[in-house]
Amino acid sequence: MTDVKKESDGPEPYSSSAFDFTLLPDYNNDFINEDDFAEFAKALAAPDHLSPSTEDLTAPQPETGKFSANNDWKPIHQRVRRRKKSKAPPRRGKDETREGFVYVLLKWPLLVVVLGWLLFLSIAYVFTRLYIYLYEHMVTWRGTRQKLRRQLQNASSYEEWIKCAQQLDTHLGSDDWKKNPSYSYYDSKTIRKVHEQLVKLRQRAESDETGKSTEKHVDGQPRAVEDLRALLEACIKNNFCGFENPRLYSETYYGTKDAVQSFIEEAEASLAFLLNSSQLDAENKRALFKHLGSNFGRTALCLSGGATFAYYHFGVAKALLDAGVLPEIITGTSGGALVAALLCTRTDEELKKVLVPALAGRITACHEDTWTWMKRWYATGARFDSVDWAKKCAWMTRGTPDCVVWSAVLASAAVPGILNPVVLMKKNRDGTLSPYSFGHKWKDGSLRTDIPLKALNLHFNVRFSIVSQVNPHINIFFFSSRGSVGRPVTHRRGRGWRGGFIGSATEQYLKLDLNKWLKVLRHLELLPRPLGQDWSEIWLQRFSGTITIWPKSIPSDFFYILTDPTPQRLARMIHVGQQSAFPKLKFIANRAKLEHLIQQGRRQYRPRGIREDIQAVLSEDDLQGLLKRTKSKSPSEEAIYPLSGSESSSSADFSRPGSPITLPLGFTFTRKNKKGLADLRTDPKALTDTPNSPSLSARLTGWWNTKSPRDSHPSTPKDPSRSLSPFTHHDRPNSMFELRPPKEVRDLQARTHGRPQHRNSDFLEEIRRRSSAFVEGEGSDDEGRAGRYRRGDVDAGAQDAEVYGEPAEFGDNEGDGEEVQSAVGLGLEGKGL
C-alpha cells in the first residue's frame, strides 16, 4: 500500500505527455444530448409554484368584473390613480422574529460595533500569524534542518518524499519516539496485549489449517480460529484504544509508533487469514465481515468548494490514486462537486490519463467576454448561463446513463450572483428527463454545509473523513499549534509550540474570539441577508475532518478566481495538491489496509456474490446440453429431474421439475438460516423403523375437510395413467438449482415413489401461494415466479446448499438472524420460508 509503481501511474504534472490533450480519453466526445438540455431549459423557465413572489402564468386568470360610473355629474376626463401592486412579502417578517421597539433601535448600532470589533480581531490575527511565520523561519528552520526541509518540499514523487521525510525524522530524533510505545493519546498497554494475542491465535490457527498442529482439540472447547475471530470482532473498531488518533501521526514526518504499526500489520494478517481460511464456512465469514464493516466504518474523500481554487483537488486525488488509497465514497461541494463528478464517473486507469494539465482544454466554463456576462448579470442577476454550464459539464460527468450528475453539480455550484438556482433532473424509465422534487430549485450547498459529515455517516457509515479544504476565506484559520498529520512541530524537537507558547496562545485566543462574535451576529440576527442568504454560515460551519489537507495557494489565485485555468497553471495546482497530500498518505494507508480487506470480505461472501460460483458446478456447455435433452424427450419418457421423477406427489396435482417429495416420518431437515448442506442430519434408524405416514399436506387437508364440508374431497390415490407430464407447463428447468439435488434427497426417491396422493383444497393452495419464497425467473405465472419453492418445497434450501454452499437468496440481503422453524409432531423440520 502506498508503494508507488512507476509503470502504472499516470504522467507527472510537468512531463511533456501531460500537456498532450489528444491523449485524454473521449476528448472529442462531448456527451451532449440536446433533448436532455431542452428539458432542462424548459424546467428552468417554468414558474416556481413554491415562491409567493413569482407569478404563475399557467394558473387560470380571474374573471374581470363589470364596472359602472358612480354618477353622471363627475368629469369624464378625471385622472384615476392606479393602485400600486403590493410588494413582495419581506424575507423575514416581524412575526417571524418577534421584533420590538428595542430591537429596531439597537440593531444597527450593535451591528456596527460588532463588525468593528471583528475587523480589529482580524487584523490582530493576521499580525499574529505573521509573527509565528517569522519566528519559525528565523529560529526553527536553520542549518541542516532547513536543508532537509527544502529537499522534502522539492520532492517530485512520493517515493522520493518518503526518503527525505525519514532523513528529517532521524535528524530530529523522532526514531527514538517511535520505539517507545508509551504515549498519552492512546492505550499502549491494551494495544500491546491485543497484538501479542493476535499473533499467538493466528499462528495456532495456521497450524490447524495446515494440519501441523501438535495440540489435540478437546470437544466443547473453542478452536483457535474461533478465538481469533472473537478477538478481531472486539478490536477491529473505529479508533480502537486510540490507534487512529491523528496525534500519533503528528509527531513525525513519516510513520507512527512501532507498537501501533505492528498492531495494524498483525490485524491485517489476521483478517487476510480468516478471509481465506477453510475452517469457517461462508455464513460465518459473511456475518464476521458484516459486523466488522459496521464497527470499523467507511472512509470518504470530501472536496470543498472554492471556485477555481477547487482545481487543487486534482492534485490531491492524483496522489491518493497513485498510492492506491483513493476512497470509494467521494463527495464534493460547489467547485469540488465538479472534481468529484469527474472522479466518480471514470475508472482508475482512465483517471491516471485524465488528471493531467491537458485537462485544462476541457474546462471552458468562463470563456465568455466581459461585456457578454455583464449584460446577463444585469438582466438575470447571474454571471453565467445555467444551460451553457450544463453542456460544459456533460463531459466531466461523462453522460452518466442512470442519473443526471451534471444537474447535481450545477445545483451545488449555484452561488447567488454567479449562477441562479437550478432544477435537479431525474431520468425516467424511457430515458427522458424530468424535474426532480416537483421542480424545486437548489443553490450552492457550501453556503450551509461545505463538508456533509453527518449525512455521510448516516447514509454510508462514514467514520473516517479525508477533507481537501481550499476555501480561500477559511484557509488562513487552519493552524495547528502542536503540529498536524505528517507536519510535526520542529521547535525543541517536537516538544514545543509553533511560534513559542505565547504565539500559539495568542492565535488560539483571537480565533476563538472571532468565532464567538460571529455567533453573536447570527443568534441575534443582526447581520443583513443580501440575496436572501444567511452569510454567517460560511464562517461558522465545520470545515475539517479526521484528516484535513489544505494546499497552499498563492496571491495570483485570487485574481483568477473566476477564470478558466491554462495548462501551465493547472500543472502547478496539480503539483501543489500532490505535495500537500504526501504527509497524510501513511495514515490513510494504515486505515485502508484494514478497510479494503473488510470490504473484500463483504463483497465476496454476500449472498448475491455467491451466484458467481455456479461455473464451478455446471459449465455453460453442461447447461445447454441438459436443456436440449429436456426438450427432446417426449411426455411419456421418464423425467430427467430426480426430484420430479416420481409420478406421485403429496402436494400437487401433477409432477413438475423441483416438486417436493413426501418425506418419511422421522426424517428431518433441521437447518439454520443460510447454512450449508453439512448441516443436514438424517436418522437412519428412523428411516428404517418408522412406518409410513401421510404427508404434511395430507394431514392438513384432512383437518380442513372436517372444518369445511363443502370443500371436502375423499383422499383417494391418483391414477398414474392420468398423471400429467412434468413438462406440461415447463419445457426447461425452473432454475439451475434443480439440476443437482442433494444426495440425501435422491436416496429417498425409492421410499416415496409409491405414496398415495391427496387433492389439496383451494384454501391450502392459497396459503402456499402466499407463503412461498419467490425467486427471479421468466414468465408471469405463479409457477415461473415461485419456481421450486412453491407447494412447501422444504428441500429447496438443501438443494441450494449443495450448489452454492448456502441458500440462494438473491439480492443484497444481509440479515444476520438465525431461524429454526420446526413442525412439531409431524415428523418434519425445515427452514421457515
Curated annotation (Swiss-Prot):
Residues 644-655 have a biased composition (Low complexity). The active site is at 334 (nucleophile), 444 (proton acceptor). This is Patatin-like phospholipase domain-containing protein SNOG_00918. It is found in: Membrane. Residues 301-457 form the PNPLA domain. Probable lipid hydrolase. Residues 809-819 have a biased composition (Acidic residues). The chain crosses the membrane at residues 108-128. Keywords: Hydrolase, Lipid degradation, Lipid metabolism, Membrane, Transmembrane, Transmembrane helix. A motif (GXSXG) lies at residues 332-336. It comes from Phaeosphaeria nodorum (strain SN15 / ATCC MYA-4574 / FGSC 10173).
